[in-house]
Amino acid sequence: MYDLVVDVRARLGQYVGPFDVSNVRVLGYGHLGDGNLHLNVSSPDGYHAELEKIIEPFVYQWTADRRGSISAEHGVGAMKPGELRHSKDEASIEAMRRIKDVFDPRGILNPYKVLPPRKAGPGSKL
């Protein structure tokens, strides 16, 4: 699991572009009991969209290739519900929606922040 940290560091080492990655730190920490790894990537210069563009798609693909999940005990949050499709198929996401519908039938608890929106199509509820 910690191989992700090593592989992200290697990915940064291959980067050629306008953003200086020489001082970027990549650390992993998590929960051994349930196999969660939190990836912390930081730059002394603060947040850079370029750094996110270098790393984020790589991490999603790396995780999908190993049949992992990009979410764990904290969920995917408000900014990335659509990214759940990297590690869960549509049937699994629909099962999650149905469970949520049981406990939140009016959709008032964190609307659009937990699961990606339903794809429009025959028989879909939007």
Identify the meaning behind each predicted range:
Residues 1-126:
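Conserved glycine-rich FAD pyrophosphate-binding loop
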